Amino acid sequence: MTDFLSSVTRKLTCKTFLIERMITMEEHTVDLLRECDSGCAMAAESLEQIRDFVSDQGLWNEITASYEKHQDLDLRIKKTLRAMEEQGKEPGKMASAWSWMSTEMRMMAKGGAKEAASIVTDGCNMGIKTICGYKNQYSGASKAAMELADELTGMEENLRNHMKKFL
Protein backbone atom coordinates (compact mmCIF):
# COMPACT_ATOMS: atom_id res chain seq x y z
CA MET A 1 0.00 0.00 0.00
CA THR A 2 2.85 2.38 0.85
CA ASP A 3 4.50 1.70 -2.51
CA PHE A 4 1.21 2.40 -4.25
CA LEU A 5 0.77 5.72 -2.41
CA SER A 6 4.37 6.69 -3.14
CA SER A 7 3.85 5.93 -6.81
CA VAL A 8 0.62 7.98 -6.96
CA THR A 9 2.27 10.85 -5.09
CA ARG A 10 5.22 10.85 -7.52
CA LYS A 11 2.89 10.85 -10.53
CA LEU A 12 0.79 13.67 -9.11
CA THR A 13 3.90 15.67 -8.26
CA CYS A 14 5.22 15.14 -11.79
CA LYS A 15 1.88 16.14 -13.36
CA THR A 16 1.64 19.19 -11.10
CA PHE A 17 5.16 20.21 -12.11
CA LEU A 18 4.34 19.84 -15.81
CA ILE A 19 1.12 21.84 -15.47
CA GLU A 20 2.93 24.60 -13.56
CA ARG A 21 5.64 24.62 -16.23
CA MET A 22 3.06 24.89 -19.02
CA ILE A 23 1.32 27.77 -17.22
CA THR A 24 4.65 29.54 -16.72
CA MET A 25 5.55 29.01 -20.37
CA GLU A 26 2.24 30.48 -21.52
CA GLU A 27 2.58 33.45 -19.14
CA HIS A 28 6.16 34.10 -20.28
CA THR A 29 5.10 33.78 -23.91
CA VAL A 30 2.26 36.28 -23.53
CA ASP A 31 4.42 38.70 -21.53
CA LEU A 32 7.27 38.58 -24.05
CA LEU A 33 4.91 39.03 -26.99
CA ARG A 34 3.26 42.00 -25.28
CA GLU A 35 6.63 43.66 -24.76
CA CYS A 36 7.57 43.01 -28.39
CA ASP A 37 4.23 44.50 -29.45
CA SER A 38 4.92 47.59 -27.39
CA GLY A 39 8.48 47.81 -28.72
CA CYS A 40 7.37 47.54 -32.35
CA ALA A 41 4.76 50.23 -31.85
CA MET A 42 7.25 52.52 -30.11
CA ALA A 43 9.80 52.04 -32.89
CA ALA A 44 7.22 52.67 -35.61
CA GLU A 45 6.00 55.86 -33.87
CA SER A 46 9.56 57.13 -33.56
CA LEU A 47 10.48 56.29 -37.14
CA GLU A 48 7.36 57.98 -38.43
CA GLN A 49 8.15 61.09 -36.40
CA ILE A 50 11.79 61.34 -37.42
CA ARG A 51 10.94 60.72 -41.07
CA ASP A 52 9.11 64.07 -41.17
CA PHE A 53 12.40 65.87 -40.45
CA VAL A 54 14.49 64.02 -43.04
CA SER A 55 15.30 65.55 -46.42
CA ASP A 56 18.09 63.13 -47.43
CA GLN A 57 16.37 60.66 -49.77
CA GLY A 58 18.64 57.74 -48.87
CA LEU A 59 18.03 58.17 -45.16
CA TRP A 60 14.30 58.67 -45.74
CA ASN A 61 14.20 55.39 -47.71
CA GLU A 62 16.03 53.49 -44.95
CA ILE A 63 13.71 54.85 -42.27
CA THR A 64 10.59 54.18 -44.35
CA ALA A 65 11.63 50.60 -45.12
CA SER A 66 12.29 49.93 -41.44
CA TYR A 67 9.00 51.58 -40.45
CA GLU A 68 7.14 49.20 -42.78
CA LYS A 69 9.04 46.17 -41.44
CA HIS A 70 8.17 47.17 -37.86
CA GLN A 71 4.52 47.56 -38.85
CA ASP A 72 4.50 44.12 -40.51
CA LEU A 73 6.15 42.43 -37.52
CA ASP A 74 3.76 44.17 -35.13
CA LEU A 75 0.79 42.81 -37.10
CA ARG A 76 2.22 39.28 -36.82
CA ILE A 77 2.75 39.70 -33.08
CA LYS A 78 -0.81 41.00 -32.60
CA LYS A 79 -2.15 38.08 -34.66
CA THR A 80 -0.24 35.63 -32.46
CA LEU A 81 -1.61 37.27 -29.32
CA ARG A 82 -5.17 37.19 -30.69
CA ALA A 83 -4.77 33.48 -31.46
CA MET A 84 -3.94 33.06 -27.77
CA GLU A 85 -7.00 35.18 -26.89
CA GLU A 86 -4.74 37.85 -25.42
CA GLN A 87 -4.40 41.59 -25.96
CA GLY A 88 -1.31 43.49 -27.05
CA LYS A 89 0.38 46.26 -25.13
CA GLU A 90 0.65 49.90 -26.09
CA PRO A 91 3.88 51.77 -25.40
CA GLY A 92 3.94 53.57 -22.08
CA LYS A 93 2.54 57.09 -22.27
CA MET A 94 5.50 58.62 -20.45
CA ALA A 95 8.04 56.81 -22.61
CA SER A 96 6.22 57.86 -25.79
CA ALA A 97 5.95 61.47 -24.63
CA TRP A 98 9.62 61.61 -23.65
CA SER A 99 10.70 60.06 -26.94
CA TRP A 100 8.58 62.48 -28.95
CA MET A 101 9.76 65.53 -27.00
CA SER A 102 13.45 64.64 -27.09
CA THR A 103 13.30 63.93 -30.83
CA GLU A 104 11.57 67.25 -31.50
CA MET A 105 14.11 69.16 -29.40
CA ARG A 106 17.15 67.45 -30.92
CA MET A 107 15.93 67.93 -34.47
CA MET A 108 15.01 71.59 -33.89
CA ALA A 109 18.35 72.28 -32.22
CA LYS A 110 20.64 70.51 -34.68
CA GLY A 111 18.56 68.95 -37.45
CA GLY A 112 19.97 67.27 -40.52
CA ALA A 113 20.60 63.72 -41.61
CA LYS A 114 23.44 63.20 -39.14
CA GLU A 115 21.28 64.08 -36.13
CA ALA A 116 18.36 62.03 -37.44
CA ALA A 117 20.65 59.01 -37.90
CA SER A 118 22.02 59.54 -34.40
CA ILE A 119 18.51 59.58 -32.92
CA VAL A 120 17.57 56.42 -34.84
CA THR A 121 20.79 54.73 -33.68
CA ASP A 122 20.02 55.63 -30.06
CA GLY A 123 16.50 54.23 -30.47
CA CYS A 124 17.82 51.01 -31.97
CA ASN A 125 20.25 50.55 -29.08
CA MET A 126 17.46 51.14 -26.56
CA GLY A 127 15.21 48.66 -28.37
CA ILE A 128 17.92 45.99 -28.45
CA LYS A 129 18.70 46.41 -24.74
CA THR A 130 15.04 46.39 -23.78
CA ILE A 131 13.96 43.35 -25.80
CA CYS A 132 17.06 41.36 -24.81
CA GLY A 133 16.25 42.15 -21.18
CA TYR A 134 12.71 40.88 -21.64
CA LYS A 135 13.99 37.73 -23.35
CA ASN A 136 16.09 37.05 -20.26
CA GLN A 137 13.22 37.90 -17.91
CA TYR A 138 10.75 35.70 -19.79
CA SER A 139 13.18 32.91 -20.65
CA GLY A 140 10.40 30.34 -20.31
CA ALA A 141 8.57 31.74 -23.36
CA SER A 142 7.84 29.55 -26.34
CA LYS A 143 10.35 29.12 -29.15
CA ALA A 144 8.03 31.02 -31.51
CA ALA A 145 7.86 34.01 -29.15
CA MET A 146 11.63 34.00 -28.73
CA GLU A 147 12.03 33.93 -32.52
CA LEU A 148 9.75 36.96 -32.89
CA ALA A 149 11.81 38.78 -30.25
CA ASP A 150 14.99 37.81 -32.11
CA GLU A 151 13.48 39.09 -35.34
CA LEU A 152 12.74 42.42 -33.67
CA THR A 153 16.25 42.80 -32.26
CA GLY A 154 17.66 41.73 -35.63
CA MET A 155 15.67 44.49 -37.33
CA GLU A 156 17.03 46.99 -34.81
CA GLU A 157 20.61 45.80 -35.37
CA ASN A 158 20.15 45.99 -39.14
CA LEU A 159 18.72 49.52 -39.02
CA ARG A 160 21.47 50.63 -36.65
CA ASN A 161 24.08 49.32 -39.10
CA HIS A 162 22.40 51.14 -41.99
CA MET A 163 22.54 54.40 -40.03
CA LYS A 164 26.35 54.35 -39.86
CA LYS A 165 26.77 55.91 -43.30
CA PHE A 166 24.66 58.90 -42.22
CA LEU A 167 26.45 59.59 -38.92
Segment roles from a protein language model:
Residues 6-25:
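Short, Lys/Arg-enriched N-terminal segments with co-localized hydrophobic residues
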Residues 25-54, 115-139:
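Alpha-helical bundle segments that constitute or directly flank the non-heme di-iron/ferroxidase center
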Residues 27-36, 57-75, 113-117, 143-155:
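Alpha-helical scaffold segments that form or flank carboxylate-/histidine-based iron centers
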Residues 37, 41-44, 51, 64-67, ...:
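Generic structural concept
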Residues 44, 71-74, 78-81, 102-105, ...:
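A structural signal for well-ordered alpha-helices, especially hydrophobic packing surfaces
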Residues 49-61, 134-147, 166-167:
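Inter-helical turn/loop segments and adjacent helix faces that build the functional surface
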Residues 75, 79-128:
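Carboxylate-rich helix-loop segments that flank metal/cofactor sites and access channels
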